[in-house]
């Protein structure tokens, strides 16, 4: 019996070494465990993003369609509604035997330089970076992810439990709110602006 156990231990060690060598010989490849996508959608005034740990970057651009580009453990799904786009993670379950380069994971949402009514982004642990998007309202909520907004020109509501917030106003919008329970919050106002904080 002991010989049988030793034989299985040797076989397991050889297979583990073979998998490690394969992962080393193919650097940067996820060996089928990551999902990638690059999709285009018509303009919508209402945009909602609901993800777990995927970082979200919103980039304004000169195109005429909304573009979603991503690399993630599970595929992202997009659902078009009445003047709305909802992006979420699919219910597909993925188990990976290999360590992935998670720093290259994330979702990039390219928004045409138009006016939007409402943009809502929710992540559990992903970071959110917002470019100078023009929207009536932008709401971003994370549990532990950081929120960075550059050249903000929209009414915004940013909330995180333990992440950090950097809000850089292009012009101050009355009624904007920032809340971070245990993280840091930094607000940059335009020169010459008059601001009252509550």
Which role does the model predict for each range below?
Residues 2-123, 129-141, 150-159, 168, ...:
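Acidic (Asp/Glu) and glycine-rich low-complexity loops/linkers
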Residues 125, 144, 182:
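Residue-level signal for short, function-critical loop segments
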